[in-house]
Amino acid sequence: MKRFLGILLFLIVVSDLRAQSDDYIQIPNYDFEKWNNVNTKNEEPDSWHSFKTSTGPFHYLLMQQVERHTETRPGTKGKFSARIFSRSIVGITANGNLTNGRLNAGSMFPAGKKNNNYTQRDSEFCTEINGIPDSLTVWVRLRTKDEKSYGRIMSYVHGDADFVCLTGGWEPYDMLCAQVEYEFPSTEWKRLSLPFKDYTHLCDEPRYILTSFTTNKRAGEGDAGDEMLVDDLYLIYNPSLQCSINNENCATDEVEIEYIIKGTMSPPNLNLPDNEVIVTISLDEDFKDYVEIGRKTTDISGTIKCKIPKAFIGKNCFVKVQTTNYPMEIIRKIREL
């Protein structure tokens, strides 16, 4: 009985693949399950912040506008979401505002430039990141008194600076790597998938991510009682599939598939079934007729040792490796000696 050819490597060398990091950073407490100072006026989700931890000369005027809420998005296993809401303060509407950075209350006027959200490095008011996600996904529910009111989501991947998110801009200008800016009307629970816009021509060294939610797209507008629920935020890194086929140290009728999965295969806010890596073999490249020879339930890289059916021994054949949750496939020819 003849053996299959030795090692087929494609895309890049397997040893290099193993050396690459599978660490895809998420914003801590992305599911809003952990909270600090519960049932007090200083209640905030862990790693997220609102007016009660703000800075600036007018921060003492600000009141609580975020709270833990027991209404959660459809299908979640979590118990809590974050509720942000608007208030009327001395006749001025203060929009609900939640950020993983820090709020600054530098002006008495809602639209004042000194009222902003910012990254405060070397503190709890920042989130470090080492790459640029492809998109931000999150579940939201927005209710406003005026149907013309729009909520807003902003997220900035930026360089090594105390980056400031401003109305209609950001500072420092040359520190932006990627941006999400999205406005939306009142809605019941909805999962949003928001792609990051590339700004690496300004800065290509990501260090932090600053993400914020507000009940109105314009400061000082909207009505007291407008509210947004936020749940299960998840950064998406588009997945890729690579692999090698190896029959060293295998029996003559076996082949070992080493597959490398990178990126987000099964986002926890999408309620997908478990991802499966499936290996099939066929005599034709179109796989009109094929036999499954391996399967594993996993989201991460690994190996599958497959038994080759007798009908394929001594013939040229094709092997397909595919995933289910984020459909990807690779087809390679195995040439028999």
For the regions a protein language model found, what residue spans apply to each?
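Bacterial Sec-dependent N-terminal signal peptides
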Residues: M1-D23, C243
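Aromatic (Trp/Tyr/Phe) and Gly/Pro-enriched flexible surface segments
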Residues: Q20-T137, K148-N238
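Aromatic/hydrophobic beta-strand junction motif of beta-rich domains
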Residues: V138-V140, V255-P267
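Beta-strand signatures of extracellular beta-sandwich domains
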Residues: M154-Y156, E276-T280
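Short, aromatic- and glycine-rich surface loops/edge beta-strands on solvent-exposed regions
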Residues: R207-T215, G314-N325
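Proline-enriched interdomain boundary motifs that mark the N-terminal boundary
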Residues: P239-I245
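Short, solvent-exposed loop/linker segments at the N-terminal edge
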Residues: N246-D253, L270
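Edge beta-strands of extracellular beta-sandwich domains
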Residues: Y326-L337
